A protein has these predicted regions:
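Extracellular secretory-pathway ectodomains and N-terminal mature segments of eukaryotic proteins
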Residues: 2-295
């Protein structure tokens, strides 16, 4: 009886989530700041540099900046993987992202792309390392509603987001990434993952993530999950675990007011289903979805 109930509710949660985080097919973005011609030195440099990124990013802990060439043929590139990616996963995510990018932006001097579960690749004919770029950005939400008292939810959520943002911003020049979870009443938990490209300063990382959190709040407050993606930072929260936690990147929280809580229910939808939906870019546009333009 219990098992059956469990199975029913699990699959209904699951299908709900798959519909709900059905987001955005916006990536990749080709910038309209100039084109190169086929077989040009810039084009060859771009292809060489992009080809090196999957291996270099995965060998380097999930983040790499690199350049190739001289003068007007110089290409700058950045690649980053989600902080809990294995080197193998990082390689294949960056490889996929680059192939999509090259298919979509065959001759653009600058382009940017991300995949949902997630990796970021950006290249340009000028240096953008350490520069905070807030656009293009995408904000999407899980269509389920928060069912608990929103006032109490907000307090827990804000404190969790504050903790993960502080922890990630205070990371190193090779990793600015944090996850965290907080108890919401006796039976629910909130999970969050935030990450900046670690070429950003602490202050710029903090700013990128806080602007992403407020963007979520202004578009989608009351929804039970959301993602905000920008060229330099990634923000996501859900009411189920969707990352692999690691003590060294877990933000510590002040203990909740009522400490006598039983463990959270075990039934959580497998994050892969949602993540692969995000990754495949099968996102549906939603009322609150915000996509803003490119410079
Ligand atoms: C670059 O090429 C694209 C087509 O591939 C074209 O739409 C765009 O206008 C070009 N941009 C510039 C700045 O020439
Ligand atoms: C680019 O180079 C290839 C191989 O060298 C050649 O076959 C092709 O015609 C060239 N394309 C252009 C537009 O010059
Ligand atoms: C990246 O890869 C290239 C060639 O694959 C290699 O020569 C270079 O040293 C690598 N750079 C870094 C920073 O790992
Ligand atoms: C890289 O991605 C492309 C297209 O997604 C795929 O065809 C290719 O096999 C991948 N390469 C590796 C080494 O995984
Ligand atoms: C969430 O709440 C909104 C407005 O309160 C309602 O229109 C919507 O149907 C709810 N969504 C779900 C999945 O319950
Ligand atoms: C929600 O919680 C706040 C603070 O605990 C309380 O003041 C408020 O009455 C609650 N609202 C509802 C609708 O239960
Ligand atoms: C930032 O991290 C360092 C260790 O890397 C730690 O000593 C310091 O207390 C942290 N600062 C904040 C504000 O968390
Ligand atoms: C946790 O993070 C540390 C430091 O980044 C790393 O050395 C370790 O391999 C990670 N552990 C797991 C299980 O991923």
């Amino acid at each position: 009886m219990w098992v059956k109930l469990q199975a029913v509710s699990l699959s209904s949660i699951l299908s709900h989530l798959i519909i709900s985080i059905s987001l955005v097919g916006v990536a990749p973005r080709c910038y309209d700041t100039g084109n190169f011609t086929t077989n040009s030195t810039y084009g060859r440099n771009r292809d060489l540099l992009l080809d090196s990124l999957p291996r270099n990013a995965s060998a380097n802990g999930g983040f790499i900046t690199a350049t190739i060439g001289q003068g007007s043929d110089k290409v700058y590139a950045l690649a980053m993987c989600k902080g809990d990616s294995t080197p193998e996963k990082c390689f294949s995510l960056v490889n996929d992202t680059i192939h999509e990018l090259m298919d979509t932006c065959p001759n653009q001097k600058e382009a940017y792309s991300w995949t949902g579960d997630f990796s970021v690749v950006h290249y340009a004919d000028h240096s953008f390392f350490g520069t905070l770029e807030l656009e293009p950005s995408v904000a999407v939400y899980n269509t389920g509603n928060v069912t608990s008292n929103l006032t109490e939810f907000d307090t827990v959520w804000e404190s969790l987001i504050n903790s993960v943002v502080r922890k990630a911003s205070n990371g190193s020049s090779s990793l600015k990434y944090a996850t965290g979870e907080a108890e919401l009443g006796a039976f629910q938990r909130i999970y969050s993952l935030v990450q900046c490209t670690p070429d950003l300063s602490e202050q710029r990382c903090d700013s990128c993530l806080r602007q992403s959190a407020s963007r979520y709040e202004s578009c989608c407050h009351g929804k039970q999950g959301g993602v905000v993606q920008r060229p330099n930072c990634y923000f996501r929260w859900e009411m189920y675990p969707f990352y692999t936690a690691n003590a060294s990147t877990t933000a510590s929280l002040s203990p909740p007011p009522s400490p006598s809580s039983p463990p959270p229910p075990a039934a959580s939808p497998p994050p892969n289903s949602v993540d692969s939906e995000i990754r495949k870019g099968k996102y549906r546009s939603a009322r609150c979805m915000l996509i803003s333009g490119i410079k």
